[in-house]
């Protein structure tokens, strides 16, 4: 007599135990690799604003200095904004007109402490409050001319001290003919063209500070971008000396970026772009719209369904590659498990049915033999 046995379960652990480690492998790779979230370049200030301040490091591929925005280029409470294709540092302090004069560490007097901080932001150099009230006249008025009134003896005495070194200059008492030395390194400062009060264009605020230190005169940032009627600036050469650089040599390199320069539209254009930013081009009188991702049209009113993917930068391409490999492995494992189940289950059921039929056949033969004997 053959007892009936329940069919074996095809989805048992023994069937797929050889593939479990393949399922765990992608999970382990995800835990170890932890790819960062892909994101496009920030389109507004809120995209990079964190509780601790401005931080665009997650968007920075270090390929083009035009799109860098970090604490080294916009310090002293400056606000880093993107205007068109350029990132600029804006110092918009809402200072009141209260007259509470303070003396700054650069030897200049300011109407109040707010104006001192605003000057530090524009010059991108640290200016501390030395004392309350205006700076003493004998210590220099802060005009930067380096000339001290008085007799020739008094003037000679003053020039033999380090009091004349201003605007970030350091005094070198061991030098024979040069008292003030400017140890300012602008090699790591990002490109952010500015127009200074001396009518010259500079690549960044650090170069303005450097020129102010070298000339020992007050040079401030007047406007963003290059000066309209100027072609020269001062730069430091490898031997530490200063030389004038003709901007005409680099005009071709900067022409493309200047050509695409845009400025935000006035407030009365609010609502001109439905899903984007309103901008004015320097070559166009009518405003234009810079649409957000997924939108198109003159006023960004149409949805663009062709935007189905984001092209990552080369720095993040390795994370995309890891994710693609993990996805491929998971699909392959699922296919193998499905094939395993579909091939082994019918075979197991077929063997069970054969055994069951064999048992019934033997039982019928025994019954027939007994009947014949009777």
UniProtKB/Swiss-Prot annotation:
It holds the Pfam family Kazal_2. Residues 261-301 form the EGF-like domain. Residues 342-374 are cytoplasmic. Residues 90-137, 181-229 form the Kazal-like domain. Residues 356-374 have a biased composition (Polar residues). The record marks 97-98, 188-189 as: Reactive bond. Keywords: Disulfide bond, EGF-like domain, Glycoprotein, Membrane, Proteoglycan, Repeat, Secreted, Signal, Transmembrane, Transmembrane helix. Disulfide bonds join 91-121, 95-114, 103-135, 182-213, 186-206, 195-227, 265-278, 273-289, 291-300. Glycans are attached at residues 204, 230. Highly expressed in adult and fetal brain, spinal cord and prostate. Expressed in all brain regions except the pituitary gland, with highest levels in amygdala and corpus callosum. Expressed in the pericryptal myofibroblasts and other stromal cells of normal colonic mucosa. Expressed in prostate carcinoma. Down-regulated in colorectal cancer. Present in Alzheimer disease plaques (at protein level). Isoform 3 is expressed weakly in testis and at high levels in normal and cancerous prostate. Residues 353-374 are annotated as: Disordered. This is Tomoregulin-2. It comes from Homo sapiens.
């Amino acid at each position: 007599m053959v007892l009936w046995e329940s069919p074996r379960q095809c989805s048992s652990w023994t069937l797929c135990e050889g593939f479990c480690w393949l399922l765990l492998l992608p999970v382990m790779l995800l835990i170890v690799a932890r790819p960062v979230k892909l994101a496009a370049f920030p389109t507004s200030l809120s995209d990079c604003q964190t509780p601790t301040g401005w931080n665009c490091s997650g968007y920075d591929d270090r390929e083009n200095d035009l799109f860098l925005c970090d604490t080294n280029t916009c310090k002293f409470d400056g606000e880093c904004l993107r205007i068109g294709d350029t990132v600029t540092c804006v110092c918009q302090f809402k200072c009141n007109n209260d007259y509470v004069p303070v003396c700054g560490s650069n030897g200049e007097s300011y109407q109040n402490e707010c104006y001192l901080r605003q000057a530090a932001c524009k010059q991108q150099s640290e200016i501390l409050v030395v004392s309350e009230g205006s700076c003493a006249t004998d210590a220099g008025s802060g005009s930067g001319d380096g000339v001290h009134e008085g007799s020739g003896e008094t003037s000679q005495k003053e020039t033999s001290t380090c009091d004349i070194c201003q605007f970030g200059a350091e005094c070198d008492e061991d030098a024979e003919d040069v008292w003030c030395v400017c140890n300012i390194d602008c090699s790591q400062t990002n490109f952010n063209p500015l127009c200074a009060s001396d009518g010259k264009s500079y690549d960044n605020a650090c170069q303005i500070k450097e020129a102010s230190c070298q000339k020992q005169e007050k040079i401030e940032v007047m406007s963003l971008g290059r000066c309209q009627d100027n072609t020269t600036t001062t730069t430091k050469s490898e031997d530490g000396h200063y030389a004038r650089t003709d901007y005409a040599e680099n005009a071709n390199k900067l022409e493309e970026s200047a050509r695409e320069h845009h400025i935000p539209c006035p407030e009365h254009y609010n609502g001109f772009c439905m899903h984007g930013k309103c901008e004015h081009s320097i070559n166009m009188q009518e405003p234009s719209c810079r649409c957000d991702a997924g939108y198109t049209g003159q006023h960004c009113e149409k949805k663009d369904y062709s935007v189905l993917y984001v092209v990552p930068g080369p720095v993040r391409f390795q994370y995309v590659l890891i994710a693609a490999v993990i996805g491929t492995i998971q699909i392959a494992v699922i296919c193998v498990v499905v094939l395993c189940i579909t091939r082994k289950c019918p075979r197991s059921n077929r063997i069970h049915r054969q055994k069951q039929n064999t048992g019934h056949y033997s039982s019928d033969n025994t019954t027939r033999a007994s009947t014949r004997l009777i």
